[in-house]
Structure formats: C-alpha cells, structure tokens
UniProtKB/Swiss-Prot annotation:
It comes from the Eukaryota. A plastoquinone binds at H215, F262. The chain crosses the membrane at residues 41-61, 125-141, 153-166, 208-228, 279-295. The keyword Thylakoid applies. 2 of the reaction center chlorophylls (ChlD1 and ChlD2) are entirely coordinated by water. The lineage of its organism: Eukaryota, Viridiplantae, Streptophyta, Embryophyta, Tracheophyta. Pfam families: Photo_RC. This is Photosystem II D2 protein. Chlorophyll a PD2 binds at H198. Photosystem II (PSII) is a light-driven water:plastoquinone oxidoreductase that uses light energy to abstract electrons from H(2)O, generating O(2) and a proton gradient subsequently used for ATP formation. It consists of a core antenna complex that captures photons, and an electron transfer chain that converts photonic excitation into a charge separation. The D1/D2 (PsbA/PsbD) reaction center heterodimer binds P680, the primary electron donor of PSII as well as several subsequent electron acceptors. D2 is needed for assembly of a stable PSII complex. It catalyses: 2 a plastoquinone + 4 hnu + 2 H2O = 2 a plastoquinol + O2. It comes from Cryptomeria japonica (Japanese cedar).
Length: 353
C-alpha cells in the first residue's frame, strides 16, 4: 500500500500570526497593532503630567512654583519646560545632564521632554488606531485624516516651534495658566493675531462650531417622528432602514433662509470635515513659520505716520504698542536668566501719554 505524505491542511501559525490574532481579536477595548504605540505612550505621558503637576517644582528652570505640593491649583500647576541653557537636549534620564538621578532629572525639566515626546507618539498612535479599526471594518479613513489636524497643531506648537528657537524653554509648559502665558508670548513677540494663518485657524474652529450648531439644530427640527423610548438610545432602532430626518425639508428651509443650501448629505458632511481640519492645518503651518521667525502683516505706513503725528492712531498702531509693552514687561519676568532690566523711561507709552 502506498501512503502519500503531504502538508497538513492547517499550517502551523507563525509568531506574527499569533500576535496578530491576539491584538486584533474582537474584545471590549480594541488593542490592535496601533495599541502597542498608543497605550504605553499615553500611559507615560499622562503619568508624567500627573507626577509633575503634583510634586515637581519649576524653581530651577523658571523661578516659579508649579506643583500642588507648593500650593498651586489645577489652573496654575504645570509641567514646565527645561531651562534655556539646556537648549534642545533630549534630557534622557541616563543622559549627561541628569546621569541617572531622578530628582535632578525632574529639577532640570526632564519631565517636560518626557511628556511632550510620549504625548506626540501617543496622539499618532491614536490616529493609527482609527485607521486600523477603519480598515478592519471596511470604513473609509476620514476619522484618522481628521485627527491629523490636532496632531499637526500639537507637533508644531510643542516641538517644531521650540526647535526653531533657542531651546525647549520657549515651548509651552503643560498647564492651563502656562498655556495662557504662552499665548501672550506669541502675541507680544510674533503679533500672532494678525498672522493670516492664525486667522484661517480661527475661521476653521469657529466655523466648525457654527456648522455643528446649525447641523444639530436642523436635524432636530426635521425629525420624521420622535420615538417613545425613555432616552435617545431606546427611541430608535440603530438598524432602521428609513431616514431619521428629512433632508428635503432641511434643504428647503435653508434655501429660504440663505438662498443657498447643501443639496446632499455627502457634500454637507464633507464640508463639516473640511472646515475645522483645514483651519487647524493652516494654523499649524503658521506656527512653523513662527519657528523660523517669519513676520505677520506689517502696515509700516501707519507706523511711520503714527510716529510723526501724535494725533494719528489706528487700532493697528495701538496693538503694536501693546505688543511692545508685552515684550518689555514680559521678557524680564519670563526670561530671568537674561537679567533684563528696563528703566521706566524706555517702557512703551501710547501717543496720548
């Protein structure tokens, strides 16, 4: 009798197949390959931020108190940037600055670099998570594309801007009041509000808020019928075949209001995606420009006339004077390592004074 030897119908799984099966299986919280980047980085970024705001001072880097331990509250606590003298050092715990000393590492601002880098990779991991899940259930990847906008803003503000300046010192510290200080710094030193990329960013964010409000109200106004369930989740069957609201009625309403209206849901929802994402991307591009110290609009003719004529002043020239005031008053406070001292007679005053 002849016995034919052949391969088993079930081939032996490789290590990659085993990992892929475990990572991508259906569970309450999806892990996925993106989770290998997302979960550790998000854990370390949040853990570093909570540790820094609770225990770590900014005395050695900014001359400030910045932790709950020192008396700050949620609005004033922060994980502060390293000192300007450390330039763009990665501030690794085992690096030449801290030499493995955790306390010294925290004093030097190592937690800021730790939180910033892990935060950036955590956000990228979250975007990849959306892309991976979309691929798994055969959706288009527009969620991931949309999330690229806040990633672009984070990377441009926290990483690219300080890379263009003299050090991480000029990045925002991770805290509420610290972000407010950074905004004032951006205005005083870069005239950020007059930057066209900032204008596009504001238009995108506020325009998106307006679109969301209009869209939500319109859908509520044109529901075919209210459900009789106790709440929204029980009122309607998620697998219903019919539409929930009348697009035709909504189109007629806004056609009468504005004279124009979206004719189909695809264009409507793409526009709601396009406005905020484009706005945030433009804002990120503008911050990259600031990293290179590119200037905003300059209306020099108005500045010259205001300097020659004490009675001539515009909102622009007043803002320029305010920016000078921010720089003069803020630099000495914000950069104590420079030992800046401005006599009162050189501090800016308006034409009226």
């Amino acid at each position: 009798m002849t016995i034919a030897l052949g391969k088993s119908s079930k081939e032996e799984q490789t290590l990659f197949d085993i990992m892929d099966d475990w990572l991508r299986r259906d569970r309450f919280v999806f892990v996925g390959w993106s989770g290998l980047l997302l979960f550790p980085c998000a854990y370390f970024a949040l853990g570093g931020w909570f540790t820094g705001t609770t225990f770590v001072t900014s005395w050695y880097t900014h001359g400030l108190a910045s932790s709950y331990l020192e008396g700050c509250n949620f609005l004033t606590a922060a994980v502060s940037t390293p000192a300007n003298s450390l330039a763009h050092s990665l501030l690794l715990l085992w690096g030449p600055e801290a030499q493995g000393d955790f306390t010294r590492w925290c004093q030097l601002g190592g937690l800021w670099a730790f939180v910033a880098l892990h935060g950036a990779f955590g956000l990228i991991g979250f975007m990849l998570r959306q892309f991976e899940l979309a691929r798994s259930v055969q959706l288009r990847p527009y969620n991931a594309i949309a999330f690229s906008a806040p990633i672009a803003v984070f990377v441009s503000v926290f990483l690219i801007y300080p890379l263009g300046q003299s050090g991480w010192f000029f990045a925002p510290s991770f805290g509420v009041a610290a972000i407010f200080r950074f905004i004032l710094f951006f205005q005083g030193f870069h005239n950020w509000t007059l930057n066209p990329f900032h204008m596009m960013g504001v238009a995108g964010v506020l325009g998106a808020a307006l679109l969301c409000a209009i869209h939500g109200a319109t859908v509520e106004n044109t529901l075919f019928e209210d459900g009789d369930g106790a709440n929204t989740f029980r009122a309607f069957n998620p697998t219903q075949a019919e539409e929930t609201y009348s697009m035709v009625t909504a189109n007629r309403f806004w056609s009468q209001i504005f004279g124009v209206a979206f004719s189909n849901k695809r264009w409507l929802h793409f526009f709601m995606l396009f406005v905020p994402v484009t706005g945030l991307w433009m804002s990120a591009i503008g911050v990259v420009g600031l990293a290179l110290n590119l200037r905003a609009y300059d209306f020099v003719s108005q500045e010259i006339r205001a300097a020659e004529d004490p009675e001539f002043e515009t909102f622009y020239t007043k803002n320029i004077l305010l920016n000078e005031g921010i720089r003069a008053w803020m630099a000495a406070q914000d950069q104590p390592h420079e030992n800046l001292i401005f006599p009162e007679e050189v501090l800016p005053r308006g034409n009226a004074l």
